[in-house]
A protein has these predicted regions:
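Helix-start (N-cap) detector for alpha-helical repeat units in TPR-like alpha-solenoids
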Residues: 52-53, 87-88, 131-134, 169-171, ...
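Register position in tetratricopeptide repeats
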Residues: 65, 99, 103, 146-148, ...
Length: 316
């Protein structure tokens, strides 16, 4: 059975500090989703829809073909009122709640549906041989990732279980990379991001690989993947993040002219970035141009009067 793939890759809508860069995906949450359906899910999934009620059975088949998740929730809820442990109703209830949840704009609504998905799928797994076991673990892994940082271990656990059950989604390795990154296990994270890149070498994945190498202290590899991201991407926000990190790497390597070039390109895309003005100030200070450095610190403060770095440079 193939579930809808790569539907929830996210691009943040504002620049964050380096310490938070790895949260891009799926970023993940609070940003626009990029959708790509997997129609094989609906063909193969129909073989597993089952109910003692033939009408309910037919209804779920039709709703699944139509991707009508709201009605699937309603119908399976009705089945579960009569038989709370119906494994097929639990599985499809979980799937439908998950796909409904990730499309919510309200965080409260999103968590409501995600929690319902987890509840149904965990109950389905109480059966010795639940239907669609690998697919259920896959959706559980994604659900726990979307529940937040404190559930990253469970996200990794269930995604690994789904792979062990011979189900590998197009984004399985990306979710594993994200989960291990959230756990601070960057070596494991890198392993799965590289596997993801074998099949889906996207600009976002290149950026994520660059960030992971950066966290591991491998600046040369980080630079390589940042340049790949810049050359491939048509997304200005992603390009901005890649160039900002390139500027930081060049600064650490004392390649100040290269660093200046990247930060100036960031300002062309986002002239109201206080961090970029501040880092340009740092570049000019390192080059011995104190007047220009202070000018950029002041620009950072005009945009963000509480910018800690600029305040420290100007008033300490």
């Amino acid at each position: 059975m193939m579930l809808p793939q790569n539907r929830f890759n996210f691009t943040p809508n504002k620049q964050r500090r380096r310490a938070k860069i790895l949260k891009i995906l799926v970023l993940l949450a609070g940003s626009a989703a990029a959708f790509a359906g997997g129609t094989a899910l609906y063909r193969l999934g129909l073989r597993y829809v089952s109910s003692s009620d033939a009408v309910d059975h037919k209804t779920i088949r039709l709703l699944w073909e139509e991707k009508n998740y709201g009605e699937i929730i309603r119908v399976t809820d009705s089945i579960l009122k009569k038989n709370p442990m119906d494994p097929h109703a639990l599985v499809f209830n979980g799937f439908a709640n998950f796909y409904t949840g990730v499309n919510q704009t309200s965080a409260e609504d999103k968590i409501f549906y995600i929690d319902a998905a987890v509840k149904s799928l965990r109950r389905a797994k109480l059966h010795s041989r639940p239907p669609l076991r690998g697919e259920a673990d896959y959706i559980l892994g994604k659900s726990y990732y979307h529940k937040g940082l404190h559930y990253a271990d469970l996200s990794a656990r269930y995604m690994l279980d789904s792979i062990q059950e011979k189900y590998i989604g197009q984004d399985s390795y990306e979710y594993l990379g994200l989960a291990f990154s959230s756990l601070g296990e960057y070596g494991e994270s890198l392993k799965y991001f590289l596997k993801a890149g074998e099949n889906n070498p996207s600009d976002l994945l290149f950026l994520t690989l660059a960030q992971t190498y950066y966290q591991l202290g491998d600046k040369a590899s980080s630079e390589e993947y940042l340049m790949r991201a810049v050359n491939k991407s048509q997304d200005p926000l992603l390009t901005e993040k890649a160039r900002f990190l390139l500027g930081d790497i060049y600064f650490q390597n004392k390649e100040y002219i290269k660093s200046e070039e990247q930060y100036l390109k960031v300002l062309e895309m986002n002239p109201q970035s206080p961090d970029t003005h501040f880092h340009l100030g740092e570049v000019y200070a390192a080059l011995g141009d104190g007047v220009k450095a202070r000018a950029y610190y002041r620009r950072a403060l005009r945009i963000d009067p509480n910018h800690f770095g600029a305040l420290r440079r100007l008033y300490n």
